[in-house]
Amino acid sequence: MFKLIKVALLAIVALAFTATAYADFTFVSWGGAYTMSQQKGYIDTWGPVKAGKTKIAVENYNGGLGEVKAQVESGNVKWDVVDILPVDAINGCDEGLFEPLNMASWEKGYLKSIADNGTGNPGTISECAAPQIWWTYVIIYDPKKFPGKKPTRMKDFFDVKKFPGKRGVHTWPQAVLEMALVADGVKPSKVNKVLQGEGGTDRAFAKLEDLKGHVVHWSAGAQPLELVKSGSVVMSIVYNGRAGAAILSEGASFDYIWEGQVLDGDWIAVVKGAPNKDEAIEFLKHATTCESQAEQAKYITYGPMRKCGLDIIKKGEPWFHNGIAVLPHMPNTKKRLKKSVLTDPVWWADHNAELKEQWSAWMAGNK
């Protein structure tokens, strides 16, 4: 009798462990093609999901730390994993909004591997955030609009006499000021030093005067593609992933100006007090493997933050899911990184508010 009870209790414990070992949890990201690439790249490929042991509910948000902070401070945490920008990774960890990850224990040489990304960035910006992708602000144009000499450098974007026509520019100053300095002759590797030094922002705004009267502003990621397609502008700043998807999946006729692209990144973190913290951390280990980062690139042209992911793509080209080569559309190849500006999220977090008035005045003068 007691033996049967013992066996029954062990069975109940085993079932309970099985039920909780891979609990369902929530993954929060930005939506659209990017979230789809995450779904196919490392959500659907995670062992517990493939085996039917867990389900991952995907939700979208508009970024920032507001909702994360509200959940943590209320003690009612509903989100588990969140895709975040660098400044939110840094600030969120400092404010105790994300779980420390102890990434050094994930796999042998992990920290060294994520630092080996070719950007000069140390790889780890926070003990609470794991590496995801590099994306970039880049210039695109329709080559049919320039039957003769084509624009190839950032200074061409600012030269409305040599390359006449409207330019698409987003409604916030990040990346625009960096691009202006590149167009003004600053080497991409020196842009942050100049921008952050005495008179740096004034120099950038002075260069922006070259575009006066030739700007169409956009605020949503799909808009600049439509502006170029329709001929409303001849060139535009865009997110490279949007442009890559339009070219590779839709056959759009765009070309890039890679010089002076402004490189940024996305990271993934576990919310402090997440209801399924252990499962979430195990998921992050899978999502940030070399193989998972390469798999995501089959569906979007953002670059793996780990170089080993990029190496897998190089060996497997043509890599995009429809059989087209993806590397010509990625921002973090060795050649392109030499001509890139790596954004400084901490500086922007500290100075964005003070630049807002000057930026708003510049935008108003370009209507």
Regions found by a protein language model. Give the residues of each.
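A bilobed periplasmic-binding-protein/Venus flytrap-type ligand-binding module shared by bacterial periplasmic
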Residues: 138-145, 181-183, 265-279, 295-298
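Mature extracytoplasmic/periplasmic domains
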Residues: 271-338
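Conserved C-terminal helix/tail region of periplasmic/extracytoplasmic solute-binding proteins
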Residues: 333-367
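Paired acidic/hydrophobic, glycine-rich loop segments that form the ligand-binding mouth/hinge
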Residues: 76-83, 217-218, 234-239, 255
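Early extracytoplasmic/lumenal segment of secretory-pathway proteins
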Residues: 23-91
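Extracytoplasmic ligand-binding site segments that recognize negatively charged/polar headgroups
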Residues: 32-39, 84-229
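Periplasmic-binding protein-like
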Residues: 201-211, 248-274
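A ligand-binding cleft/hinge motif common to bilobed small-molecule-binding domains
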Residues: 88-91, 235-253
